[in-house]
Amino acid sequence: MQSSTAHPSRLALYARLVRIDKPIGTLLLLWPTLWAMWMAADGHPPPALVAIFVVGTVLMRSAGCAINDWADRDFDKHVKRTRERPLTAGLIAPWEALAVAAVLALVAFTLILPLNALTKWLSVAAVLIAGTYPFFKRFFAIPQAYLGIAFGFGIPMAYAAVQDQVPAPAWLMLAANVLWAIAYDTAYAMVDRDDDLLIGIQTSAITFGRFDVAAIMLCYAGFFGIMAWVGHALALGAAYWIGLAAAAALAGYYYTLLRTRDRMQCFFVFRHNNWFGACVFVGAALAYALR
């Protein structure tokens, strides 16, 4: 028993690498995909298609974690929250992280082989965006915007899979997701801001400085403006607007926590955005179900 504790199995280390024990990233990636799928299919997406996208989301988020740890391995050792990650701690080799990411991405791609060509081409773009995101922290002042594209690329893919096209509402939702990602990931970046300043990487929390909370709330406001337009364009019913109102109430609650700039409160806000995304989805799903 002691040996097992001291020397985790390779499988256990790979599970830690891809954050199996931390599903929040998967959920933040999944909600926008589900919003889009329900809207693209008028509330009745094929169950098999939903399953493909749910499993694909889990796989690609896991692959993204492995790539991120490989790219950030020299930075993570200087950050208290990340220095014990398997790759940073030297428990696995860099090539293993790349191999895990490649296998997961390949399995995810096999899931969409039955789908149309547009979806497949968009999946290639999604992989390129996910794979390059970690490097944007080296030079881009607000890498969270690029993260929002990566985490929202399930939106055009869902529309492509259902309609074989990507209409204006899909691109608007992607823009809304970028704003949402800046909001919740800036809260996350506020946790590590002091460490990030020391090691010299870029984050929105550093860029916004003392206007960090104001910027977060402005992003939430922009999100609601765009999603209100989408709801109007798609003639969604009262349930959708109730869902948006519930999400807005959560955003107001987040403000009361973020203004303290307490690290634990900021981390709580980041994690709690799962419920923000859920409110939007439940509202949209009910709006279609009640038609």
From Swiss-Prot:
It is an enzyme of class 2 (transferase). It comes from the Bacteria. InterPro entries: HB_polyprenyltransferase-like, Prenyltransferase, UbiA_prenyltransferase, UbiA_prenylTrfase_CS, UbiA_sf. One of its GO terms (molecular function) is 4-hydroxybenzoate polyprenyltransferase activity. Keywords: Cell inner membrane, Cell membrane, Magnesium, Membrane, Transferase, Transmembrane, Transmembrane helix, Ubiquinone biosynthesis. One of its GO terms (cellular component) is plasma membrane. Its EC number is 2.5.1.39. This is 4-hydroxybenzoate octaprenyltransferase. It comes from Ralstonia nicotianae (strain ATCC BAA-1114 / GMI1000) (Ralstonia solanacearum). The gene is ubiA.
